[in-house]
Regions:
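Cysteine-centered catalytic environments shared across enzyme families
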Residues: 1-348, 361, 517-518, 523
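Short secondary-structure boundary/capping segments
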Residues: 306-309, 345-347, 389-397, 610
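Long, Lys/Arg- and hydrophobic-enriched amphipathic alpha-helices
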Residues: 349-354, 586
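Short acidic/histidine-rich active-site segments
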Residues: 372-382, 386-388
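A mobile, often basic/glycine-rich helix-loop segment
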Residues: 385-409
């Protein structure tokens, strides 16, 4: 993985802006600590920060190829999982290769197929290709949205980057937010409306989108979306195909020129990945795999059982590690440091985020990076295969709202009267806009129609937030995390799978459990879904209280929006928040942590409300 950025403005000579271009590039150095590169051609500049994973010598970027009197230049962030097949296809068409990097395959695929190359790629990526002849720029983001690509268009020019901080470093993009941005932060956060970058004028290519910038105009195009199709496979075939698609995705993602490791939570998803990889290594005599898990200091003492998280993870982690014969290490996080890392997690996202769910992951990845550059993780199975409670509780399922954020009451309680009066309406409209796009079949039952809507909501909202979290918090330490459940072939198959098959045995992710039950311990295969762990230690809550009270004493733009009495009520009566205000576990400590992140974000980024 890497960091990419670029600036196209043919009214300027970019060679006169080298210092500014270098500053933009330097903001991405955590994404690519190994190498950096810069391409400048009068009105065009492309920047690259490289994390070396495959073909160190021949994968340097920006990479250029001359073909039929035209030079094409690429900056690429990601991993391709069908590199070998595409390379052979291109060789058969007369292309020659100087190395075995996927970057070269992507570039020559574009030369061969143009914009249709996107449909050839199986992987996680974002890239830009500059054509020196017609001075056009092609942008593309992977089908599922695992890798980010932001942009800012202005009169006569375009900026793009892996992260917003690089756009801000250009000085063209201002750290400004308007009412829409405030609604995003206060009523939708840590989620974002698809394509909306919160800062005024900043946008992001959606999953499965590409764009062409030519003659000072950007034209976006959807090259991929899930389609509603009839599921014709019977139960046995569905089980077999689910297993094949996921196993193939995992094995494709084991390719690396550097050592890789695995996240292990003791849940179904990471256990499938770990066991499949362990079996693959054993078959190919590649040795034991290395696994990591995260825990909080004294969490066994303070753990609080809930419907979302009925049991702690450590017993199941130990069981799975023994079953797969892994070299395992548990990373135990200090609760005060988890609070301290809230600030770095804002720097990683460029926005307030998942608070301690972010900061703990960031610390976890820092530790892993000391020994590894690549890891595999089990994200997104719940979104695809109905793992969350809101898929199974029909009372929640048919509520006409975002199921992970059903009420805005807690969010409203921290704001002064009259601030963002239309916040609830804003959220409602985003919800309606999304479900209206969900592809359906005329033959769908009411339940299947709603399940398609729920899949679509989770895919474009909840899942994107989790993928953003995983990308930013891991790449902040230069750790590449791969997500096999995000293979687009598996996504397509899951979208059209009837609910009675997906929920095989009337269980969340039942079809996945059934598909892999012969290789997993029964206790893990049929264990109730448990989310990413959070700290229950009162030290964390007390740290948040102390910092929030200090914030409330400041004179700041943020405090002109916040209601100190409402916040004090949360501090004094945290147990009144019985339902999460976002996701499954975010309650009183997390709303306080969100205020801490908001305060830091406004100050650190010099955010101006316009």
């Amino acid at each position: 993985m890497c960091g990419i950025a670029g600036w196209i403005d043919h009214s300027q000579d970019m060679s006169e802006r080298i210092d500014l271009l270098n500053r933009m590039s330097e903001t991405l150095d955590r994404r690519g600590p190994d190498e950096n590169g810069l391409y400048v051609n009068r009105g065009a500049a492309l920047m690259h920060r490289r994390l070396v994973v495959i073909d160190r010598e021949n994968g340097k970027q920006p990479m250029s190829v001359r073909h039929k009197d035209t030079t094409y230049v690429i900056v690429y962030n990601g991993e391709l999982y069908n590199t070998a097949e595409l390379r052979e296809e291109l060789k058969a068409s007369g292309f020659h290769f100087r190395g075995h990097s996927d970057t070269e395959v992507v570039l020559k695929s574009y030369i061969k197929y143009g914009a249709d190359c996107c449909k050839k790629l199986n992987g996680i990526f974002a890239f830009a290709i500059y054509n020196t002849s017609d001075k056009s720029l092609f942008l593309c983001r992977d089908r599922i949205g695992v890798k980010p690509l932001f942009y800012y268009e202005y009169n006569g020019g375009l900026l793009f980057a892996s992260e917003i901080k690089a756009l801000l470093a250009s000085k063209i993009v201002k750290p400004q937010i308007d009412e829409q941005g405030l609604n995003e932060i206060f009523f939708l956060g840590p989620a974002r409306t698809p394509s909306f970058g919160v800062f005024k004028g900043v946008f992001e290519l959606n999953p499965g989108e590409c764009a062409m910038y030519r003659h000072s105009k950007l034209r976006r195009k959807k090259y991929y979306t899930v389609e509603a199709k009839e599921h014709t496979d019977n139960e046995v075939t569905t089980i077999e195909k689910t297993r094949y698609l996921l196993t193939d995705a995992i094995q494709r993602q084991l390719v690396s020129d550097v050592p890789l490791c695995f996240f292990l939570s003791g849940g179904l998803d990471s256990s499938i990945i770990v066991k499949t990889a362990s079996m693959y290594n054993k078959e190919h005599k590649l040795g034991k795999i290395n696994t990591y898990s995260v825990e909080y200091r004294d969490n066994e003492k303070y753990f609080q059982k809930s419907n979302f998280q009925p049991t702690p993870d450590y017993e199941f982690i130990s069981m799975m590690s023994k079953n797969a014969d892994t070299k395992h290490r548990e990373i135990v996080l200090d609760n005060t440091l988890v609070c301290d890392a809230l600030y770095e997690s804002v720097q990683a996202r460029d926005l307030p985020g998942y608070v301690d769910v972010d900061s703990s992951l960031l610390l976890f990845c820092k530790e892993i990076k000391q020994n590894y550059t690549v890891a595999l993780s089990g994200e997104c199975a719940d979104e695809l295969f109905g793992g969350y409670p809101w898929y199974h509780n029909h009372e929640i399922l048919f509520e006409d709202c975002f199921p992970w954020s059903k009420s805005q009451d807690i969010r409203r309680s921290i704001l002064r009267d009259g601030v963002l009066k239309n916040g609830e309406e804003y959220v409602r409209q985003r919800y309606l806009d999304t479900i209206s796009l969900a592809p359906k079949l005329k033959s769908d039952t009411d339940l299947d129609r709603r399940m398609r809507e729920m899949f679509y909501l989770n895919f474009y909202w909840f899942m994107q937030c989790l993928l953003e979290r995983k990308d930013r918090c891991s790449m902040f330490s230069g750790l590449e995390v791969r997500v096999p459940f995000c293979d687009y072939r598996l996504v397509e198959y899951a979208y059209n799978m009837p609910w009675e098959l997906k929920a095989w045995g009337n269980r969340e992710k039942g079809i996945v459990r059934k598909a892999f039950e012969d290789i997993l311990p029964e206790e893990i295969c049929w264990r109730k879904k448990s989310p990413y762990p959070k700290t229950h230690n009162p030290i964390y809550f007390n740290e948040c209280v102390k910092r929030v009270r200090k914030i409330l004493k400041k004179r700041s733009i943020l405090n002109e929006l916040l209601d100190s009495k409402g916040i004090e009520d949360i501090i004094e009566n945290p147990d009144k928040i019985t339902n999460p205000w976002y996701g499954q576990l975010m309650k009183a400590p997390q709303i306080l942590a969100y205020i801490i992140e908001l305060d830091y974000w406004f100050d650190k980024y010099n955010v101006e409300i316009v």
